[in-house]
């Protein structure tokens, strides 16, 4: 099973990204860095500089373009953790056990905390793993099947900048196809509070994308946003 690791770097996160790159290399992984900080345009063949104007959406589209593995593992530049090896091992182990579509660790600061995302109407038998509506996109593993479903739908994210909807649309595809969306509370990623971008614009883009979706994705999208327990209908 090939896990392809991506780190997204942007202005102000250079040292954090280098630290993670070093951690990954110490366990035999050379991550691909999708970089939008033109102050550091090239740090090695594994760095892809896509321009200062690029935000999360362009970075994620670039990661999908470069992805040729079984699992896409994405980590934000401002996230930190001290045990990537065990997290990756658990991702593999639980894939073999549960055939998940998306697997992610807990994050210490995210809008999608347990109260907003745990789907309590779907029982999951493994300790500290929960079915969730949205894992958050700070650090997550996405199986290639989910990427392929996105491509087959011919969804057009290219017109957007912020990329808020990736962590809604991809879980929606998982629920429609009955592939678990899991958060592992055995691992917690450190993530700082606050954002450095226009959240109003991000929300406007999200709803613009929503209005362009086919009806089945709209339904799952709406449940993820406002009625997480309703997602259990996909498992009835």
PLM segments and residue spans:
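Active-site nucleotide-sugar/metal-binding loop of Leloir-type enzymes
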Residues: 61-71
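Hydrophobic targeting segments
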Residues: 2-7, 31-33
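Short, well-formed alpha-helical segments that are part of the catalytic scaffolds
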Residues: 9-26
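Acidic donor-binding segment of Leloir-type glycosyltransferases
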Residues: 21-49
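Conserved catalytic core of nucleotide-sugar-dependent glycosyltransferases
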Residues: 82-158
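A short, glycine-/small-residue-rich helix N-cap motif at loop->alpha-helix starts
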Residues: 51-59, 163-164
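C-terminal catalytic/acceptor-binding lobe
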Residues: 13, 157-236
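Short beta-strand-to-loop acidic/aromatic patch adjacent to the donor-nucleotide binding site
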Residues: 70-80
């Amino acid at each position: 099973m090939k896990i392809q690791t991506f780190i997204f770097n942007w202005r102000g996160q250079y040292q954090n990204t280098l630290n993670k790159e070093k951690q990954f290399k110490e366990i035999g992984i050379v991550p691909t860095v999708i970089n939008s900080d033109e102050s550091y345009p090239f740090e090695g063949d594994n760095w892809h500089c896509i321009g200062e104007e690029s935000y999360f959406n362009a970075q994620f589209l670039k990661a999908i373009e470069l992805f040729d593995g079984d699992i896409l593992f994405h980590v934000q530049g401002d996230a930190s953790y001290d045990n990537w090896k065990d997290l990756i091992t658990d991702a593999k182990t639980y894939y073999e056990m549960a055939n998940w579509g998306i697997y992610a660790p807990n994050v210490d600061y995210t809008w999608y905390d347990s109260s907003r995302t745990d789907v309590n109407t779907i029982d999951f038998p493994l300790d500290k793993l929960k079915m969730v509506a949205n894992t958050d996109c700070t650090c997550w593993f996405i199986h290639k099947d989910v990427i392929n479903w996105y491509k087959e739908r011919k969804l057009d994210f290219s017109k957007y900048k912020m990329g808020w909807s990736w962590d809604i649309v991809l879980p929606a595809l998982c629920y429609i196809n009955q592939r678990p969306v899991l958060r592992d509370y055995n691992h917690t990623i450190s993530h700082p509070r606050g954002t450095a971008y226009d959240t109003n614009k991000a929300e406007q883009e999200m709803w613009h994308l929503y209005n362009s979706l086919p009806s089945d994705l709209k339904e799952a999208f709406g449940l993820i946003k406002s009625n997480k327990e309703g997602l259990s209908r996909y498992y009835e």
